[in-house]
């Protein structure tokens, strides 16, 4: 499934990584190569990014582990669907939700 992944790197971790050999390049290079995002947007003024990528369950878990262990952050995964798919999913979900006691 396609996801928008958002993460913020804590300032202490970012400062440490900036002064390591190669800076943030090696870890971000690994993330780009391994997960092949379609788009990456950095947030001006802070160490944060949005990434759009096609991920299965194992890749989501792997990315969460990489980001938490290497960058000290837990990513937020937001599913991305077309408008048509969203309408179809929402319609089914509402029907099922109405069955709840």
Where are these predicted regions, by residue range?
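Conserved, structured core segments of small domains
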Residues: 1-101
């Amino acid at each position: 499934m396609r996801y928008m992944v958002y993460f913020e790197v804590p300032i202490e971790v970012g400062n440490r990584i900036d002064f390591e050999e190669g800076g943030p390049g090696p870890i971000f290079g690994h993330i780009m190569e391994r997960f092949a995002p379609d788009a990456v947007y950095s947030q001006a003024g802070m160490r944060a990014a949005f990434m759009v990528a096609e991920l299965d369950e194992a890749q989501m878990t792997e990315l969460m582990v990489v980001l938490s262990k290497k960058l000290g952050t837990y990513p937020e995964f937001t599913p991305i669907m077309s408008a048509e798919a969203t309408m179809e999913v929402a319609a089914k979900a509402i029907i099922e939700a109405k069955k709840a006691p």
